[in-house]
Amino acid sequence: MLIPYDALEVDTLTRLIEDFVTRDGTDNGDDTPLETRVLRVRQALTKGQALIVFDPESEQCQLMLKHDVPKHLFD
């Protein structure tokens, strides 16, 4: 299920993005400040380049690039 980013409370969205950008394997040795990484993800969401996907089985949200989202979720 796709969740519109603007349907989330601002603080909830920020925590989701921060969780994503601080996960193991996402920094790749990048020394970019957390605020900058959060801003980049927020911009990708507003441009429709990234989407929030909710998995009802695991009851978890994840951020995905639009081209990586399973096609059936767009139906």
UniProtKB/Swiss-Prot annotation:
Top-rank lineage group of the source organism? Bacteria
InterPro entries, alphabetized: UPF0270, YehU-like_sf
SUPFAM superfamilies the record matches: YehU-like
Q: Which Pfam families match?
A: UPF0270
Instruction: Report the sequence similarity comment from the record.
Output: Belongs to the UPF0270 family.
Recorded protein name is UPF0270 protein Pfl01_4103
